[in-house]
């Protein structure tokens, strides 16, 4: 895959735009901003919806108790819940996309792990021209403990980053 | 003046876009990004070049010595230098703008004070739809002491913020 370049394409050249989506209203608003401002009917852009699932250790730890071993039923139920969540977020994002009659290819990428690292790595791997994301995504507790995902991406993603706040 | 709204305009509605410019290559690159990606020939947008001069206390302190009183000649020479700098940055930004044959009104605003506060206040006062800026603007020492201006604006500016890094 082409590596992300922090360089400019000429006007009218097709762009690869990654929008980081999650369960929040804000990320859907960021997607709307992107469709309103970064796409044009004259250019065939590609919009990549990126959802990052938390790593299993984090998603399980909130239920965890010392010495407790999860049964395979519990683990498969949690995996199903995680899949359902991905599907719900993607469907919601697709509904937002469908409202804009735009000349845009849609792709979907689901990552797994620490959101800020996965987003920056994916942007680079996909050769993205722009990353669009909400300001407060990926959960209050993670932000409080680890700092803001959007702060990190604004610094380290290898392309321009648009940070959108929910009104 | 209309207050900045963190809401979406319909596609084709005219936009007010603030680009924070300074002496850096990166801010000129941010301006190019803006002209390539956020303006369209079909829409009459307004691009506002915002330059923030440091407050006098900061610009003078690097020359200052305890007990030293500046003569009026020194002060007026420093004021002239500051005006020349504003003029040089604005001229450079206008040259970048002129390279893009775009349907964009150009306005210039010069602020004075702490860059991050002045940028956020100006965005709000001007009713801006988008703020575009470099990642590392407004000097190494100020960043090291006070944190990044772009970090602050990404969090507190009342509109979507685009952070552009120089390649």
Give residue spans per PLM region.
Chain A
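Structural beta-alpha unit
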Residues: 1-13, 36, 80, 87, ...
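Small/aliphatic-rich secondary-structure junction motif
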Residues: 5-75, 95-105
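Small-residue (primarily alanine) positions within well-ordered alpha-helices
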Residues: 27-30, 123, 150, 157
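General small-molecule cofactor/ligand-binding pocket signal
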Residues: 48-50, 107-111, 162
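Short glycine-rich anion-binding loops that position phosphate/pyrophosphate groups of nucleotides
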Residues: 55, 113, 136-139
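A short acidic, glycine-rich active-site loop
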Residues: 70-88
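Glycine-rich, Arg-bearing micro-motifs that act as flexible, cationic patches
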Residues: 130-156
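C-terminal helix/juxtamembrane-tail motif
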Residues: 158-167
């Amino acid at each position: 895959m082409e590596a992300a370049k922090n360089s400019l394409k000429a006007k009218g050249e097709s762009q690869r735009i990654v929008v980081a989506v999650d369960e929040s209203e804000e990320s859907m608003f960021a997607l709307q901003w992107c469709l309103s401002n970064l796409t044009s009917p004259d250019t065939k852009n590609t919009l990549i919806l990126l959802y990052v699932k938390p790593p299993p250790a984090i998603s399980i730890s909130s239920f965890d108790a010392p010495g407790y071993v999860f049964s395979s039923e519990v683990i498969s139920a949690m995996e199903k819940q995680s899949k359902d969540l991905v599907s719900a977020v993607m469907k919601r994002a697709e509904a937002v996309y469908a409202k804009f009659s735009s000349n845009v290819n849609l792709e979907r990428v689901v990552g797994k792990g620490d959101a800020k690292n996965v987003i920056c790595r994916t942007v680079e791997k996909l050769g993205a021209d722009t990353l669009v994301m909400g300001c407060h995504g990926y959960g209050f507790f993670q932000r409080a403990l680890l700092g803001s995902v959007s702060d990190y991406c604004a610094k380290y993603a290898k392309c321009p980053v648009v940070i959108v706040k929910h009104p």
